[in-house]
């Protein structure tokens, strides 16, 4: 049977290729980790060629596991780590430098210099982003300034810039396509999300030649055909989205007011604001959720640096648990009369505080505080931080009501206790889907719907399946008291007043 969909999920630490059949069932999976390079303090790099090899390898593993050939694959969808920056020679296809990863902080001083020139409002107005090293623009400027001869080659159109999706499409098509999608473009710091174009003024400020930029397409579009030398046949690449936006799609959050939150090492929450390009007054990011049929849907995005990483800390540094899965059962044993707060600012605090110098702290310890109370505090910190994001979103946009339902995914959502506490603190329902791999599902749907094999948005939304809905059950006075304690704890960790 033909009509299979291949979804490539190129992440920060590993690459996965997943095959779906016509009924949206997973029939094959390949996964491979790759090397993390740390050449200097705060620097993080990937070998783009190693990533490309991991994609080829995982595709072959998935095909073998499914027992099918590449000729049975109708379309390819790609989702990827956002903002990671690659520059390669347009003819040879060889990278000029290792990829600079989104986590890399080498351009912090440059960002500070731009802020001192009072340029952040201009960047935010056009891109919806803040002047931060996370985003691609200052990484690309660094490469142009530090790789000998690169600027001249860029001005002559001899090199290509792209995020990981662009790099993979270029390699998959044998160098024929230099393209990206609107969601990945929206994270570069040089793309005008209101006018859907590369912004000449921002390019000029950062010193980036337009000749090296990819063409920007809808998320479901014709991105090119794979080189038949790779898998024996040409397969159309029909869907692309950055990882967090792909999770919005995979969770079928197609209506304004719908919200998804992904809980992994950190947490990314996105709220669909429809065609409203909301300007945040709470230092949230305004971004493109997806662009389909030429229509741009926007989102407010907030990021939490430490979510599942707090559980890893309990396991690896504190030795309170042996494996992460033990934490929920331990938290359930906590003394309900103790109110312990963990502010996990191990690497600063993200949205809406954006305090890079804040550091973690624990409040409320008594002689009776033990492992169980620490476990509960770690899990509750995720709920409190999500509350901060939702409250900021509600302050920014009238469409974010108290009736918002949160759809969740990621490793932490398997814990019933954590999801119930999340619903209690948010005072909002939390929906956990049957299929938790929503990021790769979103990439698959983009390609499959474009190919006419899977249903359209309405049909896909109807087929989205909920595993469990967690309804808020905490008394309002208890909830208000708990949140007040959290706010007091956070205020003691901040290095600057809010």
Swiss-Prot record:
Query: What is any one GO biological process for this UniProt entry?
Result: glycerol-3-phosphate metabolic process
Q: List, alphabetically, the Gene3D superfamilies matched.
A: 3.30.420.40
Q: Which residues bind glycerol?
A: 82, 134, 243-244
Control of this protein's activity is summarized as: Inhibited by fructose 1,6-bisphosphate (FBP).
Q: What class of enzyme is it?
A: transferase
| PANTHER family cross-referenced by the UniProt entry | GLYCEROL KINASE, SUGAR KINASE
State the pathway, as annotated in the record: Polyol metabolism; glycerol degradation via glycerol kinase pathway; sn-glycerol 3-phosphate from glycerol: step 1/1
What does the record give as the function of this protein? Key enzyme in the regulation of glycerol uptake and metabolism. Catalyzes the phosphorylation of glycerol to yield sn-glycerol 3-phosphate.
| Reactions this protein catalyses | glycerol + ATP = sn-glycerol 3-phosphate + ADP + H(+)
Can you tell me which residues the record assigns to a coiled coil? none
Matching InterPro entries: ATPase_NBD, Carb_kinase_FGGY, Carb_kinase_FGGY_CS, FGGY_C, FGGY_N, Glycerol_kin
**Does this UniProt record's set of keywords contain Transferase?**
yes
User: Which residues hold ADP?
Assistant: 12, 16, 265, 308, 411
Mind listing the GO molecular function terms for this protein? ATP binding; glycerol kinase activity
**EC number from the UniProt entry:** 2.7.1.30
What's the protein called, per UniProt? Answer: Glycerol kinase
The UniProt entry, under CDD domains, shows: FGGY_EcGK_like
User: Which key words tag this protein in UniProt?
Assistant: ATP-binding, Glycerol metabolism, Kinase, Nucleotide-binding, Transferase
Any one cellular-component term (Gene Ontology): cytosol
Q: Where does ATP bind?
A: 12-14, 265, 308, 312, 411
Identify the residues that bind sn-glycerol 3-phosphate. Answer: 12, 82, 134, 243
What the record says about family reads: Belongs to the FGGY kinase family.
């Amino acid at each position: 049977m033909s009509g299979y969909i291949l979804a490539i999920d190129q992440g920060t630490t590993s690459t996965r290729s997943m095959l779906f059949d016509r009924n949206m069932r997973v029939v094959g999976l390949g996964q491979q980790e790759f090397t993390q390079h740390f050449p200097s303090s705060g620097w993080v790099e990937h070998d783009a060629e190693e990533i490309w090899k991991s994609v080829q390898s995982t595709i072959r593993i998935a095909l073998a596991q499914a027992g099918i050939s590449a000729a049975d694959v109708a379309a390819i969808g790609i989702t990827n780590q956002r903002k990671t920056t690659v520059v390669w020679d347009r003819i040879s296809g060889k990278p000029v430098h290792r990829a600079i990863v989104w986590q890399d902080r080498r351009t912090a001083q440059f960002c500070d210099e731009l802020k001192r020139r009072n340029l952040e409002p201009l960047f935010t107005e056009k891109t919806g982003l803040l002047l931060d090293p996370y985003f691609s623009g200052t990484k690309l400027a660094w490469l142009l300034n530090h790789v000998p001869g690169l600027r001249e080659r860029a001005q002559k159109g001899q090199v290509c810039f792209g995020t990981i999706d662009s790099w993979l499409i270029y390699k998959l098509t044998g160098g024929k396509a230099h393209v990206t999608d609107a969601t990945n473009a929206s994270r570069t710091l040089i793309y005008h999300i209101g006018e859907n174009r590369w912004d000449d003024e921002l390019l000029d400020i950062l010193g980036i030649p337009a000749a090296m930029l990819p063409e920007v397409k809808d998320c479901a579009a014709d991105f090119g055909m794979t080189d038949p030398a790779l898998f024996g046949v040409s397969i159309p690449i029909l869907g692309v989205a950055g990882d967090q936006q792909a999770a919005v799609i995979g969770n079928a959050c197609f209506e304004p007011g719908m919200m998804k939150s992904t809980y992994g090492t950190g947490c990314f929450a996105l709220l669909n604001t429809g065609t409203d390009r909301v300007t945040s007054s709470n230092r949230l990011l305004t971004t493109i959720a997806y662009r389909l049929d030429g229509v741009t849907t926007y989102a407010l995005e907030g990021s939490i640096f430490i979510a599942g990483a707090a559980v890893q800390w309990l396991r690896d540094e504190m030795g309170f648990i042996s494996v992460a899965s033990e934490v929920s059962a331990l938290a359930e044993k906590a003394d309900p009369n103790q109110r312990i707060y963990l502010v996990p600012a191990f690497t600063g605090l993200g949205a809406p505080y954006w305090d890079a110098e804040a550091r973690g702290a624990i409040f409320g310890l008594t002689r009776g505080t033990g492992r169980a109370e620490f476990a509960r505090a770690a899990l509750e910190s995720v709920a409190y931080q999500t509350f901060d994001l939702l409250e900021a979103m509600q302050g920014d946009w009238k469409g974010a009501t108290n009736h918002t339902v949160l759809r969740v995914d990621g490793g932490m959502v398997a814990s019933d206790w954590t999801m119930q506490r999340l619903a209690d603190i948010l005072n909002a329902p939390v929906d956990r889907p049957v299929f938790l791999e929503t990021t790769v599902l979103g990439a698959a749907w983009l390609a499959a719907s474009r190919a006419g094999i899977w249903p359209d948005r309405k049909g896909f939304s109807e087929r989205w399946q909920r595993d469990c809905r967690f309804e808020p059950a905490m008394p309002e006075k208890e909830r208000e008291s708990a949140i007040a304690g959290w706010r007091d704890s956070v205020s003691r960790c901040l290095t600057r007043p809010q």
